């Protein structure tokens, strides 16, 4: 057992990844597991994090695809107030879920940003890699679900 990875982190990352990947059945499973282990506010916080990070991920991928530097610097101009209080989560948990969601959504800008923040706050490279592994496994399971 990895002491850095408690149930809240593992199930939260798995739930966030399933929501971001769109796998309906696996999302139901992880939501049920989260509700058994944690309170409703945790589930709502994960959902809020997925919503805001999906908005950010689409915007930053869109902006980074622009043909010139001026357009790549365009301001977002969308309210993301929920990030001020980390969607009701601990800062590190919020950043961890945000990294997981950004990996699922393929946003390089956000992956780099959240990784840097986690490293600056003492998280190890292995911690970062394991977040990517959780996201990868859940996305793979979601893809299999869509085949059936």
Spans of features found by a protein language model:
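Hydrophobic alpha-helical segments
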Residues: 1-148
């Amino acid at each position: 057992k990895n002491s850095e990875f408690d149930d809240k982190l593992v199930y939260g990352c798995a739930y966030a990844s399933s929501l971001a990947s769109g796998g309906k059945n696996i999302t139901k499973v992880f939501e049920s597991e989260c509700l058994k282990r944690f309170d409703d506010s945790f589930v709502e916080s994960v959902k809020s994090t997925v919503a805001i990070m999906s908005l950010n991920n689409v915007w930053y991928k869109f902006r980074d695809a622009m043909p010139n530097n001026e357009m790549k610097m365009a301001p977002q101009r969308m309210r993301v107030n929920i990030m001020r209080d980390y969607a009701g989560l601990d800062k590190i948990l919020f950043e961890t879920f945000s990294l997981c969601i950004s990996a699922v959504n393929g946003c390089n800008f956000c992956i780099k940003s959240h990784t840097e923040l986690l490293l600056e706050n003492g998280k190890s490279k292995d911690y970062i890699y394991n977040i990517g592994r959780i996201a990868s496994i859940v996305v793979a399971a979601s893809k299999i679900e869509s085949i059936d």
